[in-house]
């Protein structure tokens, strides 16, 4: 019992001491937590102040970069204390104050375009010029982008322990870009693109490996579309570098094996052809000559595939196997030239290669078109206007003017029917039997005059009109006795056609407009103006027989037509043949004909058309 009573008496004091110790430990823990919290808060405040200082420094650098005189060393030093976002702010702020966005450039911005995109006809691409508007040139845009990509993207307050980057600046003379390329879609690579010859040319050409920004350095744009004239047109392939796959590598190896086998076969074939060729047989030499030249290029180039393709392409171009001409014209013009060349060279087939019109053929076509046009234009009224009423005595007969003088041969000498043989006399008898008359006994009737034919035509028209009107019936006796003027008065008055509705008036106006564009350059040597010749020219054109086909000509053809008409009108204008004005004009025309690869005899043939009777 005693042993059990002692611990019971000590229990309350022990509990009190343990409670005191717990309270003391709690106070110490709270004190430590308060100290740690204040320390952490101080560290956090220091870190925030440090971040703020770095941000303030970056903002001050942005403000300094808005100035005009910025050196390369200062720009490189600033790159360590700013981020790409700060640099884009520099570009925006400089563009707002009308300065170039590149800090090293001191130029002012000119007229800023309002559009968002720009279409390049040279590279056939669409560029987004939203960022490009902030720069004065493509070089500044690319140099700015080149520097921006080197700026670290990490926060500025953690770069103290990092190694500063070595900034590089774009040098002058390197090309720039027009903006970011807008990718609408991406074409899938097909087997035809891989096997096409265009891909080989793209791989062989070292200039094609340059980036799109270097190819867009030229500021000038081409206003035309390149087109290919008849020939073997290569396929349009995608020249962008494609990733090398396993299948493509296998295809390349197979192609190399095939090329090596073809090379061995080519060597054997050439040796056989050389054995067959002999100096005494010209035909064999001619047959062996062309394939020998064609295949020698394949033997002499055992190098890479690119060199073999280039040499074979050059040899094929020389021998006309695959000749293609690149012309800077539009697609519509290319189709027009194809049709023109096809008409001028009807005998050339599809295998003729390059379409080339010889100067002789072009000259003959030009003279033929002008001769047909002037012949269709000429009327009886034209000859009366140029030479008066007695133009028959001035003009030549069509037979004497059109047919050249030929020398008489022995066969052309007339002979008697008996001496020429029975065959000729029999042929003449059969010819006389088929004719409605025989011999020259029949009297030749005189041709009616132009005035009588004109009067009869007017009377016939009058009779037809009166008959359909039903007003009166004219007998033949009365119509013959009446005068033409009185018959015209009996008809109802008719209003003339409106100029806009008359086809002849429209055609005459078109011809006058075309000639008015060409004549001022030809009237200088004659020292006369367009007003001095306009009345006579208009009266001459009114006598022409114009249609919807003979008034369509090229500028060169209109020039020659104007020269012909001017030569016809010089006597009417009072310019003497041997006057100083006419001599200068003749020299000018001779120079013009030389430029057109024509002769003065060709011009004489054209003017001779108006010196022959209809």
Swiss-Prot record:
The reaction(s) this protein catalyses: O-phospho-L-seryl-[protein] + H2O = L-seryl-[protein] + phosphate; O-phospho-L-threonyl-[protein] + H2O = L-threonyl-[protein] + phosphate
Record-listed E.C. numbers: 3.1.3.16
Subcellular location field: Cytoplasm; Nucleus
Domain of life: Eukaryota
PTM-bearing positions, type Phosphoserine: 9, 217, 481
Gene Ontology cellular component annotations, sorted alphabetically: cilium; cytoplasm; cytosol; nucleolus; nucleus; transcription preinitiation complex
RTR1-type Zn finger ranges: 77-160
Coiled coil: 41-68
Gene3D superfamilies xref list: 1.25.40.820
Leader sequence segment: none
UniProt binding sites for Zn(2+): 100, 105, 136, 140
Key words, A-Z: Acetylation, Coiled coil, Cytoplasm, Hydrolase, Metal-binding, Nucleus, Phosphoprotein, Protein phosphatase, Transcription, Transcription regulation, Zinc, Zinc-finger
Function text: Protein phosphatase that displays CTD phosphatase activity and regulates transcription of snRNA genes. Recognizes and binds phosphorylated 'Ser-7' of the C-terminal heptapeptide repeat domain (CTD) of the largest RNA polymerase II subunit POLR2A, and mediates dephosphorylation of 'Ser-5' of the CTD, thereby promoting transcription of snRNA genes. Downstream of EIF2AK3/PERK, dephosphorylates ERN1, a sensor for the endoplasmic reticulum unfolded protein response (UPR), to abort failed ER-stress adaptation and trigger apoptosis.
Complex formation: Associates with the RNA polymerase II complex. Interacts with transcribing RNA polymerase II phosphorylated on 'Ser-7' on CTD.
Protein name: Putative RNA polymerase II subunit B1 CTD phosphatase Rpap2
Name of the gene encoding the protein in the UniProt record: Rpap2
């Amino acid at each position: 019992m005693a042993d059990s009573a002692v611990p019971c008496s000590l229990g309350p004091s022990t509990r009190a001491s343990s409670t005191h110790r717990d309270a003391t430990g709690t106070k110490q823990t709270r004190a430590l937590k308060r100290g740690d919290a204040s320390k952490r808060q101080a560290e956090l405040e220091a870190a925030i102040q440090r971040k703020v200082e770095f941000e303030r420094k970056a903002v001050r650098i942005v403000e300094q970069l808005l100035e005009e005189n910025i050196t390369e060393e200062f720009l490189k030093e600033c790159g360590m204390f700013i981020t790409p976002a700060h640099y884009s702010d520099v570009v925006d702020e400089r563009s707002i104050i009308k300065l170039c966005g590149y800090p090293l450039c001191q130029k002012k911005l000119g007229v800023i375009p309002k559009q968002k995109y720009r279409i390049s006809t040279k590279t056939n691409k669409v560029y987004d010029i939203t960022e490009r508007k902030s720069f004065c040139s493509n070089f500044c845009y690319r140099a700015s982008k080149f520097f921006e990509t080197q700026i670290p993207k990490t926060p500025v307050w953690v770069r103290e322990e990092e190694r500063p980057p070595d900034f590089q600046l774009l040098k002058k003379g390197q090309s720039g870009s027009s903006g970011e390329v807008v990718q609408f879609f991406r074409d899938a690579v097909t087997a035809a693109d891989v096997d096409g010859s265009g891909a080989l040319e793209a791989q062989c050409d070292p200039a094609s490996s340059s980036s799109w920004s270097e190819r867009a350095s030229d500021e000038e744009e081409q206003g035309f579309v390149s087109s290919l004239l008849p020939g073997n047109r290569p396929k349009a392939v995608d020249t962008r570098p494609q990733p090398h796959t396993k299948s493509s590598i296998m295809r390349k190896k197979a192609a190399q094996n095939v090329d090596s086998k073809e090379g061995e076969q080519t060597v054997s074939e050439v040796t056989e052809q050389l054995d067959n060729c002999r100096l005494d047989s010209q035909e064999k030499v001619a047959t062996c000559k062309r394939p020998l030249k064609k295949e020698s290029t394949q033997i002499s180039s055992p190098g890479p595939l690119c060199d073999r393709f280039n040499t074979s392409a050059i040899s094929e171009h020389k021998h006309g196997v695959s000749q293609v001409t690149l012309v800077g014209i539009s697609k519509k013009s290319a189709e027009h030239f194809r049709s023109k060349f096809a008409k001028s060279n009807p005998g050339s087939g599809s295998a003729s290669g390059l379409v080339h019109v010889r100067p002789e053929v072009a000259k003959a076509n030009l003279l033929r078109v002008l001769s047909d046009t002037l012949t269709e234009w000429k009327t009886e009224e034209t000859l009366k206007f140029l030479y008066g009423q007695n133009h028959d005595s001035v003009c030549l007969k069509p037979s004497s003017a059109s047919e050249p003088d030929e020398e008489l041969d022995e066969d052309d000498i007339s002979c008697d029917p008996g001496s020429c043989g029975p065959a000729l006399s029999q042929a003449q008898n059969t010819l006389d039997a088929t004719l409605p008359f025989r011999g020259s006994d029949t009297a030749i009737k005189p041709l009616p005059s132009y005035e009588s034919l004109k009067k009869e035509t007017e009377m016939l028209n009058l009779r037809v009109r009166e008959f359909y009107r039903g007003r009166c019936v004219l007998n033949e006796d009365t119509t013959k006795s009446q005068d033409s003027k009185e018959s015209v008065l009996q008809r109802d008055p008719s209003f003339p056609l409106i100029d806009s509705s008359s086809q002849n008036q429209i055609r005459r106006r078109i011809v006058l407009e075309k000639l008015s564009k060409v004549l001022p350059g030809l009237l200088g040597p004659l020292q006369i103006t367009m007003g001095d010749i306009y009345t006579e020219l208009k009266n001459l054109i009114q006598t022409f027989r114009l249609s919807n086909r003979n008034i369509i000509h090229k500028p060169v053809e209109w020039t020659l037509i104007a020269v012909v008409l001017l030569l016809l009108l010089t006597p009417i204008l009072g310019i003497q043949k041997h006057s100083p004005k006419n001599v200068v004009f003749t020299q000018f025309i001779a120079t013009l004909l030389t430029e057109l690869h024509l002769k003065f005899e060709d011009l004489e043939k054209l003017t001779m058309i108006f010196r022959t009777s209809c």
